[in-house]
Amino acid sequence: MKQDVIKFDNEIYQIDVFMENKSGRMSCYYIDSSNPMLVEVGPSKSFPYLISSLESLGISEVKRSAMTHLHLDHIGGIGHLVEKYKEHFVYIHELGIRHLPNPEKLWKAVSDVYTEEWLSTNWGEIKPTPTKNIRSLQDKELIDLGNGRKLEAIYGPGHAKHHYTFYDEYSKTLFMGDTLGLIYPHGDFVQPNLPPPDFNKELLFNTLDDLKKLD
């Protein structure tokens, strides 16, 4: 299975999960600290690529993940991850506690935009995630990465009302989800990401202003 993994400084790995079977469409991130963290999982159809890349790094178990928001291109594979690693738990906006165990409403909302056939073909169906495997995030919550390293959860609506950005102060890295829009690896074009019904321009600009204040 094809793999595309980039190692950055401070033990951060970018993993291309070949969303829609194309490179450069969706990345997940693995922070290989003493208390590791996976950021994003991608859609269900991309799950085999994620696992293959993790195993190529010698990672046989993933105990924790953090999701920026509840859109299926970012969280669709969570149920698969929990099925594979029974003790795994995911940090996510509090709405995740309602929707991940019963993802039918998430599926319906997205299929109204993309159609069920397109979703099934390109992203794959989402599996339920048991409530016991879900941790709801609080704004400014600090998640322990070990050895004094923390991942800060920063609530940042605009793209979606359930959106968080994660800040690793140790490496000065922001994991921004869709806050900045769609940024492709080969070119300077940035496409705003404006999904119905949650997109709010004013809130998005407020979020960006807040993030600019980070050290």
Q: What are these model-derived regions, one by one?
A:
Residues 57-60, 145-149, 214:
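Glycine-rich phosphate-binding loop signature in dinucleotide/nucleotide-binding domains
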Residues 7, 100-157, 161-215:
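Metallo-beta-lactamase
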Residues 39-42, 63-69, 91-93, 156-158, ...:
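Active-site neighborhood of phospho(di)ester-bond hydrolases with catalytic His/Asp-centered motifs
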Residues 37, 95-99:
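Short histidine/acidic/glycine/proline-rich micro-motifs that form metal-
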Residues 2-56, 166-176:
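Conserved beta-strand hairpin/beta-sheet module of binuclear metal-dependent hydrolase folds
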Residues 47-95:
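Active-site metal-binding motif and surrounding structural segment of the metallo-beta-lactamase
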Residues 46, 70-75, 98-99, 160-163, ...:
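Active-site environment of divalent metal-dependent phosphoester hydrolases
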